[in-house]
Regions:
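RecA-like P-loop NTPase motor core of helicase/translocase proteins
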Residues: 1-228
Length: 228
């Protein structure tokens, strides 16, 4: 059985062949620019950004549990892919729906015995949460910077259009320590954005973006009023 990532790859393939059809033309432009003209991003970096944009602008930012429900509708597959150990071929008949399985995970006795805390926390997040896992040295900081630039550029391009899409206007990036903040994270502002964004999107992005690097004693961050 394929895992979630493999299924997403299968879903992205026809989207790629359709030349990235999207309700937002900027998504198409940016992906084509990076794939056919810029060639700045490594293959793994481009694939990560491509997957992210598919989830954001095609699937419209689903929660993780919604993805699992969509792609693993069969109870046996759902239980297997999530690594739920206490439900097996003998007792699965007592569960009628996927929600029955999720409800059972919250049973204190079951959760404690099978150590489902991390799983239930992930599945019950009330916001979308994605992990783009790449090897050390593969350029994760550049991916973060590129995603921020792409999100902001699309938001700016559509700010005067009537759309109910939840555009991003602020991004908060955490670092595990001051060493990472000083030596790596500040490179977010140094990405050659001309190699990520087409010229007509680049200028408006550069004119509007503002970076704030918080110190270890800072308690407040200044953001645009009523921005998301």
């Amino acid at each position: 059985m394929k895992n979630l990532y493999q299924i997403l790859c299968d879903e992205i393939e026809p989207w790629r062949k359709s030349r990235y059809q999207s309700q937002f033309s900027e998504v198409v432009e940016i992906l084509k620019f990076n794939k056919n003209e810029s060639n700045y991003l490594r293959t793994a970096q481009f694939n990560a950004i491509e997957t992210y944009l598919f989830l954001r602008f095609v699937k419209e930012t689903p929660k993780i549990i919604d993805l699992y429900k969509e792609y693993f509708k069969n109870l046996e597959d759902f239980v297997e892919v999530l690594g739920i150990k206490h439900i097996n071929q003998y007792n699965i008949r007592f569960f009628e729906t996927l929600d029955d399985v999720l409800k059972d995970l919250l049973n204190p006795g079951v959760a404690d015995q099978y150590k489902y805390d991390a799983l239930t926390e992930t599945l019950n997040l009330d916001y979308p949460s994605y992990i783009l896992a790449l090897a050390m040295g593969s350029g994760k900081t550049n991916i973060i910077s590129a995603i921020i630039a792409i999100e902001f550029a699309i938001a700016i391009a559509n700010e005067n259009k009537k759309s109910e899409f939840n555009f991003i206007k602020n991004a908060l990036v955490f670092a595990p320590g001051l060493t990472i903040l000083k030596n790596s994270l500040k490179n977010i502002a140094l990405l050659p954005f001309a190699k990520i964004l087409p010229p007509h999107l680049l200028n408006s992005f550069l004119a509007n973006v503002k970076y704030t690097f918080a110190g270890d004693t800072d308690r407040l961050l200044v953001v645009q009023k009523e921005s998301q």
